[in-house]
């Protein structure tokens, strides 16, 4: 019987959860769900100077916001240091690793010699077979793995295929430093083994690490997990995604106003596809996702495409769910605090009533919030440039007879208002747009908004007439 699939996401808490890490977490999560397995979370916090609790919290928060849950408690790599030392000592006892007492001066000499001979710097193995009795007094050794010197180490990769590394290029690397702390290379192997990880899905910048880690697995006689090294994400210009391409952290995308479901949908398509399907539910992703379908080539991040997908998700969202998502993100967006303060019971009801019209025009929650500002604007409204041009003498003249028409409307509904304005336009020999444009400007201070009859309903009779009155004098 085959083992249950166990994947892991193992971020370093030295900063935010970046977009590449989010995609790696998503792929691990989807594959575990697809196989009926588990995804574990390990915080690789061995770099004590750079690791922070705030960064750990931000990573956990980012994963939770994206809807990526993990099984069990998050594991701290730093807290497992005694176990890492134990395995390193076991390797020495079994003749698979050794104490190295080479001084910094000796190591520098090796590097200089390699440079002079035009070869990559490599440790020359001088302590590999020496008798420990020759150890210099008072020197704390490092522990180095006894890497094979002949042949090659093969990484069997589900995405890249078999990747071969000549063993002559893989020196006896350090697994335990002289202060007793493990190297990243060693700690990762011990943790993955002890956690029962069966499948490792990570960026292809770890491919060379995979060869060295395979050597440690083999030295311990442990099964090597199935590796899948996925291509990195590049910007639209083909260069590795960096700050100059725009937002990098998941928290930034949240603050910009993307929906987690839309970001998930966009990320899953970066390097993986299912036919021509662009939009897919989480259930479909889980059903269809398989590492063997991940592309070898780098995926390009396209902000416009993400925005289009987010807009589609917003338009298809339930109004109440979108309202809740907007309210949740208000503290994080520019101008959001003022909008949040305006959301008393009446304001909340108005915003929810406006949602069908607002979401048709917005591609992000920030745009949605901006579109909703007219509801809470103080009178007299500040007009933007286009609105001011619509409310010139001609526009005000068109608007003046509209006031009594609206005042006379009995039932203040979009249908009744539409009928009244259309009848007035016909009687005056005007096209509807000739009235709707200055009317919209007077009601919202802008030239664009949801449908003008919807705006009238959201604002209500009293506020609508007052705003029109301000403009016609």
Swiss-Prot record:
Localisation per UniProt entry: Cytoplasm
Motif 'KMSKS' region, residue range(s) on this chain: 240-244
Chief location bin: cytoplasm
Catalytic activity: tRNA(Glu) + L-glutamate + ATP = L-glutamyl-tRNA(Glu) + AMP + diphosphate
Region named Disordered: 113-136
Gene Ontology CC annotations of this record: cytosol
PANTHER family given in the database record: GLUTAMATE--TRNA LIGASE, GLUTAMATE--TRNA LIGASE, MITOCHONDRIAL-RELATED
Protein name, UniProt field: Glutamate--tRNA ligase 2
Lineage start: Bacteria, Pseudomonadati, Pseudomonadota, Alphaproteobacteria, Hyphomicrobiales
Gene that this sequence comes from: gltX2
């Amino acid at each position: 019987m085959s083992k249950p699939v166990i994947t892991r996401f193992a971020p370093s808490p030295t900063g935010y959860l970046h977009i590449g890490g989010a995609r790696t977490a998503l792929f691990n999560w989807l594959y575990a769900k697809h196989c009926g397995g588990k995804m574990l979370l390990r915080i690789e916090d061995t770099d004590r100077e750079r690791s922070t609790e705030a960064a750990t919290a931000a990573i956990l928060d980012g994963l939770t916001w994206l809807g990526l849950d993990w099984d069990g408690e998050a594991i701290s790599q730093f807290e497992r240091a005694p176990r890492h030392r134990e395995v390193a000592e076991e390797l020495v006892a079994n003749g698979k690793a050794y104490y190295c007492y080479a001084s910094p001066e000796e190591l520098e000499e090796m590097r200089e010699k390699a440079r002079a001979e035009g070869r990559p710097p490599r440790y020359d193995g001088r302590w590999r077979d020496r008798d420990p009795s020759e150890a210099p007094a008072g020197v704390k050794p490092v522990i180095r793995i006894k890497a094979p010197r002949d042949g090659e180490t093969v990484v069997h990769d589900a995405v890249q295929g078999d990747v071969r590394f000549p063993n002559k290029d893989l020196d006896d690397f350090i697994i335990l430093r002289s202060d007793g702390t493990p190297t990243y290379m060693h700690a990762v192997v011990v943790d993955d083994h002890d956690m029962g990880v069966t499948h490792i899905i990570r960026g292809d910048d770890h491919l060379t690490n995979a060869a060295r880690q395979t050597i440690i697995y083999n030295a311990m006689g442990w099964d090597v997990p199935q590796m899948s090294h996925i291509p990195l994400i590049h910007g639209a210009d083909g260069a590795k995604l960096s700050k100059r391409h725009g937002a990098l952290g998941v928290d930034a995308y949240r603050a910009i106003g993307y929906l987690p479901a839309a970001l998930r949908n966009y990320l899953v398509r970066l390097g993986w596809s299912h036919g021509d399907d662009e939009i897919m539910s989480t259930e479909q992703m889980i059903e269809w996702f398989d590492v063997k379908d991940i592309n070898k080539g780098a995926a390009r991040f396209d902000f416009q495409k993400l925005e289009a997908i987010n807009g589609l998700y917003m338009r298809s969202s339930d109004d109440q769910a979108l309202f809740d998502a907007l309210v949740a993100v208000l503290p994080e967006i520019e101008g959001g605090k003022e909008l949040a303060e305006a959301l008393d019971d009446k304001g909340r009801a108005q915003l929810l009533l406006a949602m069908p019209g607002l979401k048709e025009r917005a591609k992000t929650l920030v745009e949605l919030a901006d579109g909703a500002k007219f509801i809470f604007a103080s009178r007299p409204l500040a007009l933007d440039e286009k609105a001011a041009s619509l409310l010139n003498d001609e526009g005000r003249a068109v608007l003046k007879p509209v006031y009594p028409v609206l005042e006379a409307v009995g039932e203040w509904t979009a249908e009744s208002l539409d009928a009244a304005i259309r009848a007035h336009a016909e009687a005056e020999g005007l096209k509807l747009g000739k009235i709707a444009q200055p009317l919209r400007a007077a009601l919202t201070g802008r030239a664009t908004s949801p449908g003008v009859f919807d705006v009238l309903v959201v604002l209500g009779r009293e506020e609508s007439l007052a705003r029109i009155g301000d403009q016609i004098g």
